[in-house]
Amino acid sequence: MNQEDNTGGGGIFGLFKWTKDALFGTDISPSMKYKDQEERRDRSRYAQDDTNFSMKFGNDSNRRSTNLSRSNSWSGLDSTLHRKYELLPEYNENGFNSIVNGDHHSKERIRSLRSPAPIVPREPLRNEPTDTFGHRLHTKRRTINELSNSQIPFIPPQEDDPLLSKLFNKDGVNEVRRSPYKLSVKDIPGKFPSPLTKRDEIDNYYVRDEDACHKNREYKKAYFDLFAQMDLNSRDLEDLCEDVREQREQFHRNEQTYKQAYEEMRAELVNELKKSKTLFENYYSLGQKYKSLKKVLDQTISHEAELATSRERLYQEVDLKNFEIQTLKQRLSDLELKYTNLQIEKDMQRDNYESEIHDLLLQLSLRNNERKDTSAGSNIFSTGQYDRTPFHNGNDSYDSNSHSWDTDYLKNIDGFIER
């Protein structure tokens, strides 16, 4: 018993002590505790184990028994015990494990999953008797109303709990009920909350018949088998926790690997996005340049078409002008030829006219000379001078000042020449 108290509530001894206290240390038997308690608020009136010692009661809250402050395996219970020793990890609103997100409380809770339950008494530990059941014989019985103010609300077990299913097997209970004699709670070792109004019933405990003792031995054997199974379950649970821890470490390693790969992929994606952005900007700039060049090319093609049209029109005008020039040249050539012919003809006519005039003048001069000769017939030889015609004055050129001529006759001659 001392060895169990010194374990601090951990290991198989703490588990055994917890089970023993849960079975034999309550004011109400386990079968009566859950009987006819369908609602949760009714079940919460009863607390497990001897944690009722530290509950506060109404007006008698200052009244304490000197034998009620002993520490036990469940004296350290508070509202966070189930959260602390919960095997499954909690998840936040995003669905991720809170340990991964850096929850310090969850890390501490997971780290202490396999640690023994601490013994934290609600009052300072005193050097008092460690008898769990004997001190209750002389204490005042507490009522249900006093138990309703418990600081630790009762949490009913699950219906599929294998431990409770084996402890409270309905077949075994029905078998006991069908037996020819009814077993009293006093036939089972330990103290139960049944009212002990008569002391002689306790004194007559050792004189029950042998069948009841045999039943008690069978119950004890079942309890020890159950404890052995619980020991195996504890070992399996430790192995399972070790596997969970290893898997969690492997999960963290994989997560770190994935996170590093994600960071690398993200950095590479950012670089690719930057390159894509630069490429897109260059492509957009090139597209704008292409559009401007295409516009200039279209304008150039339009100008070239207009230039070709203008060139064609100019060529046509040049051809037309060349034709006109050729025509004018031909006409000019014809006119020059005609002018030349006319000039030649005019020169020839002038020469003819001059020749005729010369002949006429010569004839006229001869006639005048003959007339003069006729009028001065007798004295021709007496004059010593021979009158020559205007055309015979030394250089055979006509001298208009040497002799006077008939102007009317000459006018007629000039008019003939002009014609």
UniProtKB/Swiss-Prot annotation:
InterPro entries: Bbp1_C (IPR029330), Bbp1_N (IPR029328)
Residue numbers bearing the Phosphoserine modification: 29, 73, 115
Annotated coiled-coil segments of the chain: 229-355
Subcellular location: Cytoplasm, Cytoskeleton, Microtubule organizing center, Spindle pole body
Start-end of Basic and acidic residues biased regions: 34-48
Region of interest: Disordered: 34-76
Bias-annotated ranges (Low complexity): 64-75
Pfam families with a match to the protein in the record: BBP1_C, BBP1_N
Cellular component terms (Gene Ontology): cytoplasm; spindle pole body
Entry keywords, A to Z: Coiled coil, Cytoplasm, Cytoskeleton, Phosphoprotein
Subunit structure: Homodimer. Interacts with KAR1, MPS2 and SPC29.
Family: Belongs to the BBP1 family.
Known role: Component of the spindle pole body (SPB) required for insertion of the nascent SPB into the nuclear envelope and for the proper execution of spindle pole body (SPB) duplication. Connects the central plaque of the SPB with the half-bridge. Required for proper localization of CDC5 at the SPB and for proper M-phase progression.
Protein known as: Spindle pole component BBP1
Organism the protein comes from: Saccharomyces cerevisiae (strain FostersB)
